[in-house]
């Protein structure tokens, strides 16, 4: 079984004016597709890896032969991260219920959570991601990872751990056509397109 580019559950212009059509289309069909294609070259050479989901593979990169481990960390990581990212975007959803209560419990308020998340996204040097994760102790935390690392890879690999609830891509390819060097503006725009329904479902799944 090879990896495939997931279809988006919305049109490329569905998140306008916050995320623009051109960026969404290029990001999905060019950048994400490249991660899929690259990861599939390893699955072709090592077909025993094809039985694992991309999430299970990046949770235990020791499954991958040493000479391809960094390559798959980057490319399988990119496939997993982007697959989560697309599902996590939607106009018009609201943070409610158990997830909102847990955010208020662990951060003090929703605004305090947003401040921490924005800081993690803005201060990630170079390329990477900001995440809201559920830790093993049952508490929510904000973390960031470099490049295409995921919290699923664990502290030893990515410097972060936890089950991803919300993720934001802060690679320049995610925002540069619309926002140029104004990463903080892109981060602020993200709050208009977070799919809180998907986040709540992931939180319920992870609990």
From Swiss-Prot:
Pfam families: Sod_Fe_C, Sod_Fe_N. It catalyses: 2 superoxide + 2 H(+) = H2O2 + O2. This is Superoxide dismutase [Mn]. Its cofactor is Mn(2+). One of its GO terms (molecular function) is superoxide dismutase activity. Mn(2+) binds at residues 27, 82, 169, 173. Belongs to the iron/manganese superoxide dismutase family. The lineage of its organism: Bacteria, Pseudomonadati, Pseudomonadota, Gammaproteobacteria, Enterobacterales. Keywords: Manganese, Metal-binding, Oxidoreductase. GO terms for cellular component: cytoplasm. Binds 1 Mn(2+) ion per subunit. Destroys superoxide anion radicals which are normally produced within the cells and which are toxic to biological systems. Its EC number is 1.15.1.1. PANTHER family: 37S RIBOSOMAL PROTEIN S26, MITOCHONDRIAL, SMALL RIBOSOMAL SUBUNIT PROTEIN MS42. It comes from Yersinia enterocolitica.
């Amino acid at each position: 079984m090879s990896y495939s580019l997931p279809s988006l559950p919305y049109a490329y212009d569905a998140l306008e004016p916050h995320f623009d059509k051109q960026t969404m289309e290029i990001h999905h069909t060019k950048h994400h597709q490249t991660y899929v294609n690259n990861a599939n070259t390893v699955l072709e050479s090592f077909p025993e890896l094809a039985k694992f989901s991309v999430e299970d593979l990046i949770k235990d990169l020791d499954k991958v032969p040493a000479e391809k481990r960094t390559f798959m960390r980057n490319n399988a990581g990119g496939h997993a991260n982007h697959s989560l990212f697309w599902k996590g975007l939607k106009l018009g959803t609201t943070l409610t219920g158990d997830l909102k209560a847990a955010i208020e419990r662990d951060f003090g308020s929703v605004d305090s959570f947003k401040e921490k998340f924005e800081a993690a996204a803005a201060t990630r040097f170079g390329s990477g991601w900001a995440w809201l994760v559920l830790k093993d102790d049952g508490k929510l935390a904000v973390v960031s990872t470099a490049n295409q690392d995921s919290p699923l890879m664990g502290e030893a690999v990515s410097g972060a751990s936890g089950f991803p609830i919300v993720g934001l891509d802060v690679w320049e390819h995610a925002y540069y056509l619309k926002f140029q060097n104004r990463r903080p503006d892109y981060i602020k725009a993200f709050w208009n397109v977070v799919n809180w329904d998907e986040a709540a479902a992931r939180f319920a799944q992870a609990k």
